[in-house]
């Protein structure tokens, strides 16, 4: 039996090499990403012989949802099974956004962020992260990354034109899979598709300095987030072994070269761990480290998980840490850990075995 190819792996120009004329490719894109077609036979504006040809050569179901859990805060965690049987997790984070209309009335509407995985597992080995416990199985293809977003939008009846944010902060190190992640960014940005601007896509990294520079040279227009979590190399190496390859100085040099929109900032994720990196002396060092960088710091309180070595700090200590940064002119927020009760928060995702 002929093996079908995942059509979500293709940019329009690549699909155009296989399907003529080009306007048919645009129609296919619209059916998949905007009309949420379930199969090729649904694509009624295409000639019957083309629909048959597509069905004989392609599929667009690279992920299958085998389980989902909803948090009391509205977050939904999805367990997806890939074609080869491996599993990944993704999270939908709904939030309310309030605006003032022309008449001065306060109106609110739903705003969505989707946290996607870029690998099955991860090889970075961060001591505080559950994903790292199982090691790296393989990279996801661009279509498998896109497939997570498409499935979640379809399942939740989110119109294709509704603006959403994408964060590459699920399982895996995105820059360890830069080729496929960058391609996913381009596919998601297509006007005939989901039309998710790169400015609404944030790529997070544990600090692969070489790949940060490569990403910057691509000029994709994406936002960058650095998982920092420590202010000196000794502690960071203890928490994040990747620091042996790319130390803090190398990371900061790469960040300074990274092209960023004038209205945006490089995001620095800082996981506060009780008694480890949450002292005020650490906050003072962080201020020095970020000097001269257009930065925003996201403070995250450690999220407990099975077999975890660390403890969650008190909110009081986190606020003191935040206040010191803010008073020194560093833009800083304490990030709400959504999905904590369903193990969907930062550091809690993993490849769930098939016992479910």
UniProtKB/Swiss-Prot annotation:
InterPro entries: Aldolase_TIM, Elp3/MiaA/NifB-like_rSAM, Methyltransferase_A, RlmN_N, RNA_MTrfase_RlmN, rRNA_lsu_MTrfase_RlmN/Cfr, rSAM. CDD domains: Radical_SAM. Pfam families: Radical_SAM, RlmN_N. Its cofactor is [4Fe-4S] cluster. S-adenosyl-L-methionine binds at residues 172-173, 204, 227-229, 303. One of its GO terms (cellular component) is cytoplasm. Binds 1 [4Fe-4S] cluster. The cluster is coordinated with 3 cysteines and an exchangeable S-adenosyl-L-methionine. Its EC number is 2.1.1.192. Gene3D superfamilies: 1.10.150.530, Aldolase class I (3.20.20.70). SUPFAM superfamilies: Radical SAM enzymes. Residues 108-341 form the Radical SAM core domain. One of its GO terms (molecular function) is tRNA binding. [4Fe-4S] cluster binds at residues 122, 126, 129. PANTHER family: 23S RRNA METHYLTRANSFERASE (PTHR30544), RADICAL SAM CORE DOMAIN-CONTAINING PROTEIN (PTHR30544:SF5). Reaction proceeds by a ping-pong mechanism involving intermediate methylation of a conserved cysteine residue. Belongs to the radical SAM superfamily. RlmN family. HAMAP family: RNA_methyltr_RlmN. This is Dual-specificity RNA methyltransferase RlmN. It comes from Campylobacter jejuni (strain RM1221).
